[in-house]
């Protein structure tokens, strides 16, 4: 059995434009996130738990986009835009696993900010490298476990004869739309998985930031308040982008499914968010900006010498 992707433009000129546009964005995503990872691993001033989480987030987003974007680029230039049942299940499994890990990791980063601002004296003792590694590994394993359960459930359902998917890749809503035995139970099962991956981490993030805001209001120094807020604002911006798109995609009922709207939101969190994350963290964080600048300078000097 094969699925056919129906969302690609039929005009040959648009194929080339789409390929060039997506290639450019993908190149910027890989470059930006690799710069973040390299800067964090080479700059001693960034050897803290906050930057360890940021480096892990960038690493996950490199893998996250690599699951779908190369396939999108290949399909853009191919006449037959198909994928096998196994290929679709594999793509969805990795995409959901890494996307869920991303959400769980953002919750861990919120906890890190909570400890740093609300318990600054205990921060070095509480947020050890061992704990950070455990939280990152737990995020990935939890995402993988949730993904395997969801994908096994979806692909155990019968699919209709016309396997046309109104999308660019195998995401949950468009694939569920071609399931023949759609029922309230199936929709609720997918919703439970979405709540575990999106709503629960978002609740933990909201709780962390409630305590953070309360702590910030107690800081009398304007400079101290501004510094604390600047370290949180980057993370909060990324959270709103990521969770806003994911909630719109996965927490809405299937009756409100709109293929065109769905595709646009998918492009935002598949290409837009991974592209903006390095920019947000680099531009809003002076330490990160300085580290990236030094890495680029060293690279330019080594090439010129």
UniProtKB/Swiss-Prot annotation:
Extracellular side of membrane: 1-16, 67-90, 152-188, 250-262
A Gene Ontology molecular function term of the record: odorant binding
Cellular component GO terms held in the UniProt record: plasma membrane
Superkingdom per UniProt: Eukaryota
A Pfam family this chain is assigned to: 7tm_4
Protein's membrane topology: Multi-pass membrane protein
Transmembrane segments: 17-37, 46-66, 91-111, 131-151, 189-208, 229-249, 263-283
Membrane-side (Cytoplasmic) residue stretches: 38-45, 112-130, 209-228, 284-305
The entry's keywords: Cell membrane, G-protein coupled receptor, Membrane, Olfaction, Receptor, Sensory transduction, Transducer, Transmembrane, Transmembrane helix
Protein name per Swiss-Prot or TrEMBL: Olfactory receptor 10W1
């Amino acid at each position: 059995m094969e699925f056919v992707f129906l969302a690609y433009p039929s005009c040959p000129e648009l194929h080339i434009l789409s390929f060039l546009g997506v290639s450019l964005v993908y190149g910027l995503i890989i470059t930006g996130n690799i710069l973040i990872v390299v800067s964090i691993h080479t700059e001693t001033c960034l050897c803290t738990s906050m930057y360890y989480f940021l480096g892990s987030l960038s690493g996950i987003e490199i893998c996250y986009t690599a699951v779908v974007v190369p396939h999108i680029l290949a399909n853009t230039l191919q006449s037959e835009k198909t994928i096998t049942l196994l290929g679709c299940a594999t793509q969805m499994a990795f995409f959901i696993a890494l996307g869920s890990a991303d959400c769980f990791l953002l919750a861990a980063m919120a906890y890190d900010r909570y400890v740093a601002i609300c318990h600054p004296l205990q921060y070095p003792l509480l947020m050890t490298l061992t704990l950070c590694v455990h939280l990152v590994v737990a995020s990935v394993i939890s995402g993988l476990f949730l993904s395997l359960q969801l994908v096994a459930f979806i692909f155990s359902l019968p699919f209709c004869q016309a396997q046309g998917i109104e999308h660019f890749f195998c995401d949950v809503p468009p694939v569920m739309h071609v399931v023949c035995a759609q029922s309230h139970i199936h929709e609720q099962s997918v919703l439970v998985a979405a709540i575990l991956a999106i709503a629960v981490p978002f609740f933990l993030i909201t709780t962390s930031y409630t305590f953070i805001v309360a702590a910030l209001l107690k800081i009398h120094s304007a400079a101290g308040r501004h510094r604390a807020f600047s370290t949180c604002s980057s993370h909060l911006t990324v959270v709103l982008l990521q969770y806003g798109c994911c909630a719109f995609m996965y927490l809405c009922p299937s009756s409100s499914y709109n293929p065109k709207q769905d595709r646009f939101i998918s492009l935002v969190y598949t290409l837009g968010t991974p592209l903006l994350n390095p920019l947000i963290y680099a531009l809003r964080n002076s330490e990160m900006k300085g580290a990236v600048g030094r890495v680029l300078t060293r690279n330019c000097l080594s090439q010129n010498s």
